Amino acid sequence: MVCFTQGLKLDLEKPIEEQGPLDVIIHKLTDVILEADQNDAQAQELVQRFQDYIDTHPETIILDPLPAIRTLLDRCRSYELIRRLEGYMQDDRICSPPFMELASQCGEDTIAELKKHRLTFPFICKTRVAHGTNSHEVPSDDTGTPEAVDRRECVLEERIRQRLRWKMAIIFSEDGLKDVKPQCVIQSFINHNAVLYKVFVVGDSYTVVERPSLKNFPTGLSDRKSIFFNSHNVSKPESSSDLTALDVVEGVCRPPSDDVIRKISRNLREALGISLFGIDVIINNRTGQHAVIDINAFPGYEGVPEFFTELINHIQVVLQDQNPEAPQFSQNSTAPEQAASICADRACPAASGFVTMATKEAWLVEDDPSNSKRLQHQRLSCNLPPNFQNCVAPMATKASSQ
C-alpha cells in the first residue's frame, strides 16, 4: 500500500519490523533526538530502536540521516560546517559570519575571546540547540498543541520548551555581556536591511521566500541596552514591529543571486547527505555578500504550496536511483501513480509503503495568504567531490541513498 495523502505513521514504541517492510521513512525526530542527547531514557530507547532498524535494513531510504540531523541541531557544528564550506567554495559572494561558543558566564577573558574570533559589537546570541520555534522563543502559558499530536510528542515538546527558557539577544556593549546566558552561540550581527531569505530545499529543488528580519544597527560599541526578541515571531510573514521597521535602506539592497543560492544548497546537501532542510540567508548591505546565518532540519515549508508535490517527486527519484531497472516515469502519470509503479516493480508486499514519523509540521502544506514573497523555485545539480564530503560529514549514514 502506498499512501500519498497523509502517510503511514510509524509507532516507535512498537517493533518496527512488524510495521514493515518499509521503502522510505520520512521523519522529524528532532525532539526525540534532543531528549535522547539529554539522557532521557525513554527517548534513548526510541532512537536506538530506530537506529537498530536502520542498521539491519540498509535498503530502506531514510529522509534524513540521524547523524546529519544531530549536526543541524547543534549550531556550533552547523556553523563550523558553513565556515568550512565557505573555504571550500572560494566564492567572494559568500561569507560565513564569525561565531564562537560561550560555555560559561562572561568573565575577564571574554573580550579577548571575542577579538580572537573576530567578533565585534553588536553581536547576536542564540541557543546552541537549533530546532524550530523551541530554539527561538521563551515558553509561554498558551503553547497548546493540536489534538492530532500524540501524547508523547506533547510531552517532549513541553520538556524542550522548559529547558530553553531564554530568547535571542543582541548585545551592543561590554556592559551588555552580563545579559549573555550560557550555553549559547555568539554570532556577528550583519546589517541586511531587515530582509531575510528563507531557502526551503526538497531534494534537488529549492524555493526562496522573502521574510521580515531585524533592522540595521550602528556598527561598533554603543550605549544601547541589550535587545531580547523571539526570532520566530520577527521573521513571520505578517511580522510588524519596531525591530523590523527600517527607517532607510542603506547600502546594497538586492535579492539573492540564484547561482549563489543553488551553490550553497547543493554543497550543503552533498556535505550532509540530507534532502529536507532550510537555509536562512541574508545579504550584507555593505559588501553584498550572501551570509548563511542558520540551517534548519525539516522546516515548516510555509510559503511553499507545492511542497508535497516536490516531496513525492523526490521520493520517485531516490527510488529510481536505488532501482535503475524500474520503469521510467511516464509524463502522463500522476506522481502517486508513478511511485506506485516503482514500488510494484520492486515486488513490494502489500504492507510496504512510505512511512512518516513526522510531527504536525511534516505533511502540512499551507497556502501563503501573507505578504511573504516567493522569489525563486529552482533545481540543483550535485557535484561536491567525495573527499570534501568525507572531510566535513563523516556522519552520513548508509541507510540513505543521498
Sequence positions of predicted segments:
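Conserved metal-phosphate-binding beta-hairpin within the catalytic cores
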Residues: 257-258, 265-305, 373
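A structural preference for short, hydrophobic beta-strand core positions in alpha/beta folds
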Residues: 7-9, 64, 278
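A short, well-structured beta->alpha microelement
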Residues: 3-20
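Active-site nucleotide/adenylate-binding loops and adjacent lid/helix of ATP-dependent enzymes
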Residues: 19, 29-33, 43-240, 247-250, ...
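Amphipathic alpha-helical segments that line or abut small-molecule/effector binding pockets
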Residues: 266, 308-316
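A short, polar/charged loop-to-alpha-helix boundary motif
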Residues: 217-225, 301-310
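Conserved acidic residues
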Residues: 21-25
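Active-site flanking residues adjacent to catalytic metal/cofactor-binding acidic residues
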Residues: 27, 125, 187, 279, ...
